[in-house]
Amino acid sequence: IIVTHLTHSCLRSVLEQIAAYGQVVFRLQQFIDEVMGHSSESMLPGSGSVPKKSTEAPFRTYQAFMWALYKYFISSKEELAEIEKCIINNDATITLAIVVDKLAPRLAQLKVLHKVFSTGVAEVPPDTRNVVRASHLLNTLYKAILEYDDVGEASEQTVSLLFSLWVETVRPYLQTVDEWIVHGHLWDGAREFIIQRNKNVPVNHRDFWYATYTLYSVSEKTENEEKMSDNASASSGSDQGPSSRQHTMVSFLKPVLKQIIMAGKSMQLLKNLQCAESTTCQAGARDAERKSLYTLFLESVQSRLRHGEDSTPQVLTEQQATKENLMKMQSIAERHLELDDVHDPLLAINFARMYLEQSDFHEKFAGGDVCVDRSSESVTCQTFELTLRSCLYPHIDKQYLDCCGNLMQTLKKDYRLVEYLQAMRNFFLMEGGDTMYDFYTSIFDKIREKETWQNVSFLNVQLQEAVGQRYPEDSSRLSISFENVDTAKKKLPVHILDGLTLSYKVPWPVDIVISLECQKIYNQVFLLLLQIKWAKYSLDVLLFGELVSTAEKPRLQEGLVREQDTVAQFGPQKEPVRQQIHRMFLLRVKLMHFVNSLHNYIMTRILHSTGLEFQHQVEEAKDLDQLIKIHYRYLSTIHDRCLLREKVSFVKEAIMKVLNLALMFADGWQAGLGTWRMESIEKMESDFKNCHMFLVTILNKAVCRGSFPHLESLALSLMAGMEQS
């Protein structure tokens, strides 16, 4: 080729411009060759190409990216071939300026590709793990699309190119997600997926749900890597970090990350439960006909794009109809922007257009006050995100609802989850009233008769006899143990029951929900109920005749003289014996009123009412994680409302003091009037009055503040007793 009409400097400037892009093509081609396994040694010095050992095959995300570049260069070479043919045929006058002008769009694309490649691949440090490389590349493409999408119509070709690259590169990720949420198998040989399986925990282990998967998260700003275990919430990464670190690993999966984790774990658990062995063949046949997540995504994207093309004339004809809506939306958007002191008509128009694309606009803004979340993903770049929202997320959501729903149904129907939850309430929270009454009264009677009751064999025999009559299937699962606790506490009658621990053997997989940690909370409530019921029982079984007969017995046997001696041995008394007996009757009634009020409050207002709410929530639970949270929240609620939290320990101490008074009073009543001194009765009355007044004051303040509305019934009940005193 001869270009006689150009000077050397002019030719040089044109060729330098082209050569720069040639260097870009060379670097990209070198990456393609390396991933394909060709010419891995012939790297340019300092080119910073993919630093991988030749023995280790490139992971699938890089292979997919390479394939996308390869297809791009095929079309690029075809275009160059057309220009070359045109020059060879000499059909028209061709100058270098014309050639450069024809290549301008392609050169602009190469510039974008080079930027993406440099950031996403070339600049990644050599010792970086695959999980970071893959997510960094996908994030780079994702952010580039959002960035160019922001420009609008001026960069449509660039967005189209980047989108096609991203769709091709994301294929392995979506295939991994599909395999996991459909088959319950997380296949990731190169360890490039952000969720990794911990193989040390088998599926049939009770910790499977909490400790099986690890979610890796990387801050794009600082490049600091973190490992976060998807603990009981299993939703790590769904709201991680402030807006400065919003582009954590694989931003595009962020809105559905929780659903992916839930669906994947649920499907793996379902597969291992083998609850539908008879339908295995049918499931295999259905799977053969099933379209993969990636295929569904592509079809949705194509139908959305086609819909966009088809509807263009329709949009033009409907412009008049939509103009009014647009103006209405614009005025609403302007009002909401003014809340943040933003006065920008153009921004308001764009917001209005954006909201018109969303069918839930009126639902979102119907509430009045609106809080715009500034940390949300690029609110000005809705087109690409709307594509994802409508083309990818619904397919993941559908699979999430299907497999989580199946798991919940299987657990409830085949593994009797609801029955086990009811069993915990029957025995630990004593909702199986008559059964548990038979058990604990046998212990209380032993204590009253001063006999040994701490023998584990005796306790278990009593438990088995009580439970076996009405709940034979649960008797083999229940056991009770006794451990000696602090001896200083044991001096107080109310703490003599400390150390009693009820155990219920929960089978797998129900033990994922009813864990040993949950049983510890159940046991704390169980012990409190035992203490209240013991105080109540001790007061209930006292007979008026017992106290009267012990006072009148000496008189009947030895006459009036002996009676005077008996009275004298009680010490100096200001009141006759009958008045003393009357005071004890009154004190007993006051103690009974207090204990019964407390007992009714906990058994009805707390356990029964909260239990009904819990049952309803269990029925509504969509996935196992939600159910675990509901169960834990239920336990946390009853734990708090039974005043077992450290923060309100002073209230519990006052209640324990009254229960202790009741037990000491019952013990003294049993011993007979002769063992009582007037000072003892007066001190007991004084202690009770002080505790009673303290509790009424504290509870009333809490109710007036509105912080503990559930305490209102207890406060009113105790106030009624206060008036009597």
Swiss-Prot record:
Subcellular location, principal: cytoplasm
Keyword Cytoplasm: yes
Annotated segments matching region Disordered: 222-246
UniProt GO molecular function: gamma-tubulin binding; microtubule binding; microtubule minus-end binding
Comp. bias regions, Low complexity: 232-244
GO BP, sorted A to Z: cytoplasmic microtubule organization; meiotic cell cycle; microtubule nucleation; mitotic cell cycle; spindle assembly
Keyword Cytoplasm attributed: yes
Coiled coil: none
Function: Component of the gamma-tubulin ring complex (gTuRC) which mediates microtubule nucleation. The gTuRC regulates the minus-end nucleation of alpha-beta tubulin heterodimers that grow into microtubule protafilaments, a critical step in centrosome duplication and spindle formation.
Record's subunit section: Component of the gamma-tubulin ring complex (gTuRC) consisting of TUBGCP2, TUBGCP3, TUBGCP4, TUBGCP5 and TUBGCP6 and gamma-tubulin TUBG1 or TUBG2. TUBGCP2, TUBGCP3, TUBGCP4, TUBGCP5 and TUBGCP6 assemble in a 5:5:2:1:1 stoichiometry; each is associated with a gamma-tubulin, thereby arranging 14 gamma-tubulins in a helical manner. Gamma-tubulin at the first position is blocked by TUBGCP3 at the last position, allowing 13 protafilaments to grow into a microtubule.
Family: Belongs to the TUBGCP family.
UniProt protein name: Gamma-tubulin complex component 5
UniProt organism field: Macaca fascicularis (Crab-eating macaque)
